[in-house]
């Protein structure tokens, strides 16, 4: 094609056949050879072209307000173009002539690579599209021209087999982002996870996009080096040899060598270009690369984040920086308040003898980190029951200072809410204690708590003969309701690691191995998420919409507590509320069984849930997606009885003083076991899973457990009006952060939920690994103990340290900031001045 008259676009006859010096058809015939050249890293690659190969001077940035796109379809062999090329040309021409007037553009298509050595012609194009086959489609001088074009701020879009072009060029590999593995893909229908909900190429697409294409595998997964906007879900098709696993990028972008590059592995079929959604995908890519709109192509590039430790190791014999980490919250002015549970009290020894009045006495500490001074202040310390060291279930303890929240009007009133177990409230004879939620007042000038200002809002009994499961997290909604997470106050033993439902073990008449006494009991505040409305005088009222009113007359009345919003949770250490939607998010630790049992039920499942309404989450009757446990009871708890009915659970424990007939169980969104994420099994006619390991399928392939302890995180909300230069990008807006205390295969991810299904146990539609952003490993944040976003948009994280029931030199507060800069291109380099 003659490129002299560039104002003449090829849109007038979108279906006409073009003849170029290299034809697509010949490339397809030679595809096996081209693929072989790209089959692995051993292929000999050449570096970026020597700048001396060209003296071109490209206008910076290329193209102007009369936006033009150059579509190059050259290939390594000559001949007629293929129907695929013609379909792609027609689609891009159509895209350029639709949409708002200020987002339209003209298209010039050519198979003549000499255009890349003509700086005047090249300077007129805002973007170059490669609709090429494989092979060496550019000679060194032509590639040098393309490089000069990108360095001047040009745009590039690569489609499908463009990733096979220039197989010996490192620079072109960087431009594309990845190379296909050997072999030719066949057309298969699959699900594309559209994780980027803000990029113009993806924001209008469904989160789960089902479509047919030729799905390429990558020699080296580009995740972390590029910004992935969509990935293909391998469980929905047969990826074949060289599969990339759950993280299989299919479309991505990045700022590259001065310009903007977008690549999609889709577009390998003629029918792709007839799809409205696929054309919208290409349209968004072209709008960004032509500089018609700005977009962020940096958000998931892991090098754009900085993790820094904020606190120093404690001085010997002092907890001047941090206690045994157990939760954090940020104030509107950026201060970070974090608590120590009560272990590692440097001022006194661990006492485990119940005859000693000091048994379990510890200091629950509240520290404050000030980002302005970068100094830490010990705001106060409560005398808690919580310092018994490690050991077995009848020695160790998880009570202490468990949770912290700041009043919604904290900047004005200084009110701090603490969830804790005062040492003064223990009964050593009965081995019972009082748990409470108290309000204290902080002096803003000194960052000191006035311990005499305590107002006790809520208190309830807990058994302390046996460890464990205290919960602790708290969170506010926009209506001033306070959510309080409590554990089931139950031993992990006596049930083989399955349902905590052994009614027999007790101490002076109080069961410590039967979670039906607590989590499954409508009349007990343990194993719950409570919801109350604190009042200024230190009392509370009950909001409408809790699971019970406390006034139910069922089964004789007096068998419910109106504070209960959620029942049936085991150990919810962390909860959060999305400030935009008021939806509650929670995670809880499961039991200890290493494998499922056809006799007793599922293996240990750690769990995350999106909670949109008051509900029963199942413990100790059901876990995961409503997988039941086996009942047991007196006189012989070792003998299995019937399977629990998740839709009609009954509490028939002798330790129950609440309702027998319970609300139906709501399934969870995320659950995982040592074998993998989202284990599921075939079910019989009664809905009971087989629980046979060799019949398991894993619905969440991006995680698994082992040692596991779910650590719920926040939902990120991007502050568009904020001026912070460290805030995480808008890409993360609305994504839910889910993690685990451990850092191997366990989750440390941000997930995207479907609002239509999330309240009924719907699975995440997309998951993004954070392990290279919130760094794992001994020198990173190995033992995640809490995380939240501050008003600056940075992520604040607690690392528990490397021991248990203590702090050590690795116990620390960290901050993870974004350093990648804003969207591109710069506002003053937009092609038409405004977006």
Language-model features, listed with the residues they occupy:
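Secretory targeting and sorting signals
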Residues: 1-47
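Catalytic beta-strand/loop cores that center a nucleophilic Ser/Cys/Thr
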Residues: 54, 99, 178, 183-258
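Beta-propeller domain segments
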Residues: 296-302, 344-364, 390-394, 399-401, ...
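Residue-level detector of Asp-centered blade-edge/turn motifs that repeat once per structural unit
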Residues: 330-333, 406-412, 476-479, 578-581, ...
